């Protein structure tokens, strides 16, 4: 990547599919990158492109209640994917920070996610807490934990 700071931009849903498939569907029983909430009103897709205009990071932000506090607004983070060649470079944190800004515009109290165990340390480093026991997520068949952050 160049020395300029990567810029987070809003994406069309379809722009997320190739990167989601490459990162989030590798070694899983499915190759379908679509989520039911992709077209739900209020859903926002964020991304970062490299200097060649290739999408290298994406995340999806869905207004969805947090199960332990249903009376307040919450935003679910879905589809956080950073290209393998760019992982551990700070792009996930940039997407997270932009998503938090978005959630605050909605007066959300929480951001939550179903975090893959492989990415759990990222969420914990970024002030999320793990809630409850781990579980195997149905679509990917990978171990996950619920994580939440109050904002």
Task: Describe each PLM feature range.
Residues 96, 103-116:
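Conserved GNAT acetyl-CoA-binding A-motif
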Residues 116-117, 136-151:
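C-terminal "cap" of GNAT-fold acetyltransferases
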Residues 14-18, 22-73, 78:
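Acetyl-CoA-dependent GNAT
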Residues 124-134:
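Conserved acetyl-CoA-binding loop of GNAT-fold acetyltransferases
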């Amino acid at each position: 990547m160049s020395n300029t700071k990567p810029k987070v931009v809003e994406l069309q849903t379809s722009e997320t599919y190739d990167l989601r498939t490459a990162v989030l569907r590798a070694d899983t029983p499915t190759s379908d990158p679509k989520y039911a909430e992709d077209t739900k009103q209020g859903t926002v897709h964020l991304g970062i492109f490299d200097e060649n205009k290739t999408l290298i990071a994406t995340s999806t932000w869905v207004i969805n209640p947090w199960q332990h506090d249903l009376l307040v607004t919450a935003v679910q983070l879905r589809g956080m994917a950073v290209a393998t060649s760019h992982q551990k470079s700070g792009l996930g944190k940039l997407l997270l920070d932009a998503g938090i800004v978005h959630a605050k515009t909605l007066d959300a109290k929480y951001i939550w996610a179903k975090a893959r165990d492989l990415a759990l340390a990222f969420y914990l480093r970024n002030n999320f807490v793990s809630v409850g026991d781990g579980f195997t997520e149905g679509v990917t068949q990978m171990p996950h934990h619920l994580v939440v952050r109050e904002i």
